Amino acid sequence: MTTKTTPKELKAKKESKKKGSAPEPPKNGPPRTSPPNTIEKKGILRSLSFQFSNLTRKKGNDYDLTPEEEGDGYGDEMGPVLGVQNYGILMKKYKRKNRSARWAKRFFVLKECFLIYYSTSYKKVFEKTRRIDLHPKGIIPLIGCSIVSGGDVDKKNCLLIAHPQLPSAIIVAASDHQTQEMWLKALRSATKISYKNTVVGETMIRELENRGVLLNEEKKSYEERLEAEAKARKEEHDRADELAKDKEELEAEREKLIRTTKKLKDDLQNVKNELKMTNEMKKTLEQEKMSLNSKTEHLQANMESLNIEKEKIHEQLQEIVREREKVLIDNQNLSTDKCQLNNRLMEIETSRNCIMTEKEKIENLLKMNEQKTQDLEKERQYYTMKTSELMDHLKEVSEQRDLTESELKEQMMARLGAEKQLQAAEKALEHLEMALKMTGAQMTELQEHIMPDVHKLREFFEQCAEESRFEANRTGIMRNAVYARKSIFDVAFSELDGHSLDVFEKFCEYNSQVLPVREKPQKLHKTWKQSSFKRIGSIRRSKRGIRSSFRKKTDSITTQPREKEPLMQL
């Protein structure tokens, strides 16, 4: 157990702390004020004294006779620019002794009550660093100055800075009217900063600091009181927690006692239930024994052993009342016997399940065989249908072939007759030419009129002869093409013998391109003959390929067993 401090001990510790150590000033509070005799320069006064240091490097220029100029100065220390009223580029007018006035661009910075100006190149440095250089081009103090806006000869937006102590007024020009107004407001507000205002501000700051110190001390005292009260409340809370813990422990012990009593009661009830279960198990075993005796003769020997065990169990049941451990042992023996019987029943069930699975397999095989027979019947019907279609088509092709052969014979006879006529016409033309040449000078005029017509007739007959020769050669070309197509089909069908029927049908459709004769009866004889010759070879070969593939498949069906036979995909 941890030792607890009483409120009296806490008060004694606090008093000893107060006596031993003086009160420290607050960390976040304002700094302590110095005695009234010593005057410290802070805030605006310090910045003014810094700005009146020897930055201009001139001894005789007394711009202001305020006490800030008589101080020690802080020229060596130059911190960051904490506040700048305005800055920017303005035009400054300057005039030397015997020369005309000129305007020059300068970078001006308004810091508190001083207007500092640099060269224009310093603008980038100032915007980056935000620090004032210790060596400017010039400094203009604005305390007590009068600032007026107006215009000059060349410039309109001008500002005039005048002071009785300055030798001449300073003129500055802005780029537009807006910047002029902005600079005018900033400069006039800067002229209001003076020594009196700074002194008043310092006194107000000191008063506020003193008030802050008093408030911090009061705050400390209140915090100490609150800490003491909080500690007292914490102690009371700790005591209450301890009491609650003790109460919880007592309740836990009470619950434990209740649980133990419940467990004992449950154990007694379980013992009673176990005894009842043993009696019930005995009855069930007797019933099972009677049923097994009636069912099978093989189990009679086992039932006799069970009867012997039953007598033993009766003896053991009498001992159970005296000893609980013996009852458990007897229960285990009975459970083992029951397990053996259950195992035998499970063996019978497993054998029955095996028979059922074999029966299902046989049924599935029968179904598979029936499906295969149906598929084969469909394939046979499909092949018969295809063969009948091909036979019909072959009949049509044979009729077309007979027609083409008769037409070819007629053409050959017509060609021979045309050749004979051409020969007779050529002989007649030769006789005419000879007769015309044999005539004398009297027939010159007739020759001039007749000879061109004779030449034209001769050219016409020569063209007809060439066309007849070309048609005679065309029949030989067609025969050669038919033989070549037959050889290609022989090779292709030899490769397609082992493939399925779908591949064979696609090949026939792609290569035959068979069109029935009835669809296009008005076609010319030449194209009809060419298509008929092409059809004949493809259809003959397709019929042979279908017969050979059908024979191979029927042979494979008869030779191979039906379980390993792959079904044809129609």
From Swiss-Prot:
Region (Disordered): 1-42, 542-570
Coiled coil regions, renumbered to chain: 202-448
Pro residues biased stretches: 23-34
Domain PH: 83-192
Compositional bias per record (Basic residues), positions renumbered to this chain: 542-551
Keyword Transport attached: no
Family as reported in the entry's similarity comment: Belongs to the PLEKHD1 family.
Name of protein: Pleckstrin homology domain-containing family D member 1
Origin species: Caenorhabditis elegans
